Amino acid sequence: MTKLVNEMILVLDFGSQYNQLITRRIREFGVYSELHPHTLTAEEIKEMNPKGIILSGGPNSVYDEGSFRCDEKIFELDIPVLGICYGMQLMTHYLGGKVEAASQREYGKANIQIQGTPDLFKDLPEEQVVWMSHGDLVVEVPEGFTVDATSHHCPNSAMSKADKNWYGVQFHPEVRHSEYGNDLLKNFVFGVCDCEGKWSMENFIEIEMQKIRETVGDKQVLCALSGGVDSSVVAALIHKAIGDQLTCIFVDHGLLRKGEAEGVMKTFSEGFNMNVIKVDAKDRFLNKLKGVSDPEQKRKIIGNEFIYVFDDEADKLKGIDYLAQGTLYTDIIESGTATAQTIKSHHNVGGLPEDMQFELIEPLNTLFKDEVRALGTELGLPDDIVWRQPFPGPGLGIRVLGEVTEEKLEIVRESDAILREEVANHGLERDIWQYFTVLPDIRSVGVMGDARTYDYTIGIRAVTSIDGMTSDWARIPWDVLEVISTRIVNEVKHINRVVYDITSKPPATIEWE
């Protein structure tokens, strides 16, 4: 934490998949927030000087052996504390109340009734719908606490000890299903913690530029530039901070979209006057991927090769100490932490070799995708970069399901170009968060002309989202889908069938691999 942040809400991570949403909601209020491991000591927290502490939810019972705990001394810091779900139970356990397994687990929407006029529920309706997700519950609040809300299955749905600024809720206010959840969090952040709400992307730029300068000093930085939103914003931010100390390397690994390699060089080398070195490594990557079909193995191979390519280039350049990456908050969350399950490894996180020669700089690793776009705009990047489609580091390597071959890459490349062209032609670019084609390792029978065919199927994936943590399938008009399907079947060799993915996230991820 740098001194440029004069107010911050600290969220301690106990393993809930909702944790990042707490941080996100608070930032939406214009207050800076960070998610940190539950293992932080009270002394470390004191040095960070947060305006408030939130104990997140989690999958454990407070009585489980090895369950996640925090330093009890945080309750001696004279800092407001809000416990959410497991966080409320842990607070109760530490402060002398009683937690038990519920006779009936409660998952989903529930109606709560507010009692009195507690601070967290100021100016909110006496009855409201909230999102519950718990197996244990508080059966006896700690001494000096009042019960602020009840529900049919959870008599102690919320509690507080106002003179200490300690609060607990058994439900999840950060989830949209809690209809007044944002208002409750605002009451804690502004009413209890007395935050002002002056944090913005402009502040973030100043904070990160100071961090970069302090970290790098007079040393050199190598940036992994792909031309996507994340790496472009990283390059612009670091270039703004340290200028010519930054060298960008653009690796053409043969897994890019149609026309992408040429576009990247033109935009950054010519348009932004950055030092960009292009490396043609297609054969190197494809040879490594030969015979590999497991998606996790492909991701790690691609991640490793990226680092080794940078190693080779750094040896040529001499004196490179740092590697900059466009790792986002969602990358870290989905790759798992000590308290969260791994969903999939990200090339910016799980694929890094242990013997890499660089120290990492990841200035976006506390931001969500929409915040990165806002940052790009603040940095003066053009709209065609800021609103460019999200594109995974492994590229088309994970949009070809199974083994990657040049023939399959060309199929995905051409079909994806048609999809992007028609989405643009029909003015849908800003309505759809991400859209692309995938090539499952599936062949099916078809008829083209008078001949029987046995060719590949192309899948179209298009989703709406805000930050990529959750998404819904995009309702592209049927007539537009018909145009796209017809063009793909007629213009892309070895395709005789097109399908549309109508699965949300969860249960599916946005990418198929």
Swiss-Prot record:
PROSITE patterns: GATASE_TYPE_1, GMPS_ATP_PPASE. Pathway: Purine metabolism; GMP biosynthesis; GMP from XMP (L-Gln route): step 1/1. Transmembrane segments: none annotated. Residues 8-198 form the Glutamine amidotransferase type-1 domain. The keyword Phosphoprotein does not apply. It holds the Pfam family GATase. The active site is at 85 (nucleophile), 172, 174. Its EC number is 6.3.5.2. ATP binds at residues 226-232. Homodimer. Catalyzes the synthesis of GMP from XMP. This is GMP synthase [glutamine-hydrolyzing]. It comes from Bacillus velezensis (strain DSM 23117 / BGSC 10A6 / LMG 26770 / FZB42) (Bacillus amyloliquefaciens subsp. plantarum).
